């Protein structure tokens, strides 16, 4: 049956809203029935020798269980996020005889030699929105892209999440999925919780910590799930999640061995938590937010202007006189007036940009994950020439003695450098 076809990309938001409105009407006409889904996380394909076996055996175990309707994989599905790993993952996931929903985690994007382009290319999108038996499942991607830094949800994923949540009826039950737990370890956790708290979120699911744990995400019931890796155990495992009218139950499944008693129950539409022998949600009372009061300590430093982009800005900008040029992960090159921040010109490449532009007396040279080196007119932003390297470029360009230099990293046996 394969993967659910998710609602993807900003260009399709209007279609997504129409589809969700139809689904909401269906929800209003029928009561929710109980269902069960399998929840895998932190597969880390290509990490340990047994990681592939654990995933394949998990899929076999799920296929053989008639109670399971579909599967969620909540990130870190590979170890390094390179192209070979994603192609192997694609081949393994074809063994599912039931639908699955898939998200990237930090391991899938932090060290990507393909410039974080292959996950979307192979699996269609880094987020999903799907309705099942009167419950809406919403999941968004993780980051930071191409940076080994603190957990972060990319700006474009936040905007996508906000648009989907706004189009979701307030009474419609929602289960939210991300690779990261929604706490202060996530740099922009509060952006997510502020969005989710506007809707009827039953529970949030996360991986990342390789353990089963219940916690509270600013009043929203939240659960962290185990890794599918066996580690010191003889065989791997995952969670079986059953959604009922009045509760959501979490049971650990040991592959082809046993389903253990419920380790967590989220009570729905009730103030009481689970029974004393089953950990329930803890209720925090103080919700923290970033504190920028230090800015007032140094009055000599003041903000002249600022712009907020619709995607992440992953590299430093470049400045030449009164021209400031920066790039973003939507593949855009923006030239601004350095004095007031007003747009001078923009130029679109075909994929993400993680590199800083190089400015010469006449040109702005940019490398992009579309595989091209772009040389733009510095004054007008029009293309003067471009060169195809046939592979995503994440390295910054430099110009010396009339030559452009950059570097390419291939996972094939023949990496190459080129100077132009």
Question: What are the language-model segments listed below?
Answer:
Residues 25-88:
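N-terminal active-site segment of His-dependent metallophosphoesterases
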Residues 31, 244-312:
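A short C-terminal boundary segment appended to hydrolase-like catalytic domains
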Residues 83-162, 166-170, 191-203, 213-225, ...:
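Extended active-site neighborhood of metal-dependent phosphoesterases/phosphodiesterases
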Residues 305-330:
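Beta-strand-rich domains and repeat architectures in extracellular enzymes and scaffolds
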Residues 321-322, 361-362, 401-402:
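Short coil/turn segments that connect the beta-strands within blades of beta-propeller domains
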Residues 337-340, 377-380:
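Short loop/turn segments that connect beta-strands within beta-propeller blades
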Residues 410-417:
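Conserved small/polar residues in nucleotide/adenosyl-binding loops
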């Amino acid at each position: 049956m394969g993967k659910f076809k998710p609602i993807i990309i900003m260009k399709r938001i209007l279609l997504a809203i129409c589809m969700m409105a139809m689904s909401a009407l269906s929800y209003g006409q029928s009561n929710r029935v109980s269902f069960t889904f399998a929840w895998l996380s932190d597969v880390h394909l290509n990490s340990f020798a047994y990681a592939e076996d654990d995933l394949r055996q998990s899929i076999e175990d799920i296929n053989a269980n008639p109670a399971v309707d579909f599967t969620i994989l909540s990130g870190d599905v590979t170890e390094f996020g390179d192209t070979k790993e994603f192609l192997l993952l694609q081949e393994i996931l074809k063994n599912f005889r039931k639908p699955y929903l898939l998200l990237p985690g930090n391991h899938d994007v932090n060290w990507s030699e393909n410039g974080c382009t292959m996950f979307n290319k192979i699996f269609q999108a880094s987020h999903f929105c799907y309705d099942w038996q009167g419950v809406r499942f919403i999941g968004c991607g993780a980051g930071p892209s191409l940076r080994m830094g603190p957990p972060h949800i990319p700006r474009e994923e936040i905007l996508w999440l906000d648009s989907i949540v706004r189009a979701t009826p307030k009474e419609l039950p929602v289960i939210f999925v991300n690779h990261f737990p929604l706490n202060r370890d996530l740099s922009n956790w509060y952006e997510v919780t502020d969005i989710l708290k506007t809707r009827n979120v039953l529970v949030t699911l996360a991986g990342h910590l390789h353990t089963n744990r219940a916690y509270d995400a600013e009043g929203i019931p939240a659960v962290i799930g185990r890794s599918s890796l066996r580690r010191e155990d003889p065989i791997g495992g995952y969670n079986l999640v059953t959604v009922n009218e009045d509760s959501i139950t979490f049971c650990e499944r040991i592959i082809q061995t046993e389903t253990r008693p419920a380790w967590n129950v989220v009570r729905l539409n009730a103030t009481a938590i689970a029974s004393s022998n089953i950990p329930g949600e803890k209720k925090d009372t103080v919700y923290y937010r970033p504190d920028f009061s230090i800015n007032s300590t140094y009055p000599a430093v003041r903000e002249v202007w600022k712009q907020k982009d619709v995607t992440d800005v992953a590299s430093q900008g470049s400045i030449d006189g009164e021209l400031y040029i920066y790039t973003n992960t939507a593949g855009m090159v923006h030239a601004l007036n350095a004095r007031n921040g007003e747009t001078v010109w923009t130029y679109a490449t075909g994929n993400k940009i993680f590199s800083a532009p190089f400015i010469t007396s006449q040109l702005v040279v940019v490398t992009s994950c579309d595989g091209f080196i772009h040389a733009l007119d510095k004054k007008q932003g029009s293309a003067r020439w471009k060169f195809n390297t046939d592979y995503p470029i994440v390295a910054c360009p430099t110009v010396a003695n009339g030559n452009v230099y950059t570097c390419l990293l291939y996972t094939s046996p023949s990496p190459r450098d080129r100077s132009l």
